[in-house]
Amino acid sequence: MLTRFAPSPTGYLHVGNIRTALICWMYTRNQNGKFLLRFDDTDLERSDIKYVDNIIEDLKWIGINWNSSFKQSERFERYNEVFLQLMKEGHIYACYETREELDTKRKLQLKQGFPPVYDKGALLLTEQEKIRYEQEGRKPHFRFKLDRNKTVKWNDEVKGEINIATIHISDPVVKREDGIYTYMLPSVIDDIDFNVTHVVRGEDHVTNTAVQIQMIQALKAKIPIFAHLPLLHFDDSKISKRKGGLDIKSIREDEIESMALTSYLAKLGTSDPIEAYIDMQSLIDSFDIKKFSSASLQFSLSEMYKLNSKVLQQMPFEMVQDRLSQIGSEFWYFIRSNIEKFSEVAKWWKICKFGIEPVVLNKEFIKIALSTLPQGDCNENTLSEWVKNIRQTIDIKAKDLFMQLRLALTGTETGPELAKLLIFIGRESIIARLEESQRIIQKV
């Protein structure tokens, strides 16, 4: 088994792109196959090396590796060779219509109630007419001649049996007036030359597949197995509020763990429940392309954020040790169940070890809290003893008491379990924070 992921280096990878790459890669690894990374950069003007680098970085971040890679821009000689072969055999023909002329044809067809399918008019041109057009300065574009008397059929791994009547499809342009190859032909040539056995991509390529199957047949090559995944639909109202939308670069900047995104995308649209995974191999082992539904899918940001928190909760210290600097395992195992993003670890470490901005609270409460703090090092019983001592001294609701203590010691109204926080803050620092609050109150 050999599959490929073929991004165009004309922009950042999007969630939809990375989902296709991930499913293709897991399918391959589950079957002990090989995975090929191909950069579709035939349009040299729009392609940029910075996007090549970024795509590689994003794929590595999510955990995808590959057995080999190449750029289509390295294979123009091969594409020219096959192009000339197909032209010689009558499968490709030159067209001289301008964009304006083609647009006029389309509008007329629609007005007459016909589908806007190219009429193959260029096939009727005489050699003299072609020469005249070229003398006028017209540069030809080239189309692949579809056999419109055939219905292309294949058994799709996700969508089941598909039948496409090519009579409803325009002969595709394979080479533009400026000499640049479009997506269609180079992709087919590469799949044949590199022995690609399975093609996994979005369902927006279904019509392309029908066209490419006829190209493969024209080249007398073996047709690969196809799997067309349903496209993701997004909640635009939520995504519009995100800087960068849903490209992988912005998701990484938003501190989504790679395994959170992987856990979500690998199971979205399958019969399996969406759960938090912390190792890729478990996802690979449970992968089955037949579990994917052909129904449309909704991508939920809130679901991904929930998974992010669950992934962090499951991560052992060894997985995060190199990201924690001087923070030890004890603090990690305490804090991981109370965070949504990894950066919150440093935030709470700072609160525990480096103090806070003093919070102005009730003067009497601070005085009593100081005088009733249990002696000795803080332990898991310190908070309950302290609360008992305070309530024996003043009449205060438990909810208000906890809120006052949390504000005085952490500067926040919410956070991790206070009883355990006291252990990391330490008795000395607790006293210092309460005394600082006292000094602030006296100045007010």
Curated annotation (Swiss-Prot):
Complexes and interactors: Monomer.
Major location category of this protein: cytoplasm
The keyword Aminoacyl-tRNA synthetase is annotated on this UniProt entry: yes
Positions contributing to ATP binding: K241
Protein name stated in the entry: Glutamate--tRNA ligase 1
Any one Gene Ontology BP term: glutamyl-tRNA aminoacylation
Family affiliation: Belongs to the class-I aminoacyl-tRNA synthetase family. Glutamate--tRNA ligase type 1 subfamily.
Lineage: Bacteria, Pseudomonadati, Pseudomonadota, Alphaproteobacteria, Rickettsiales
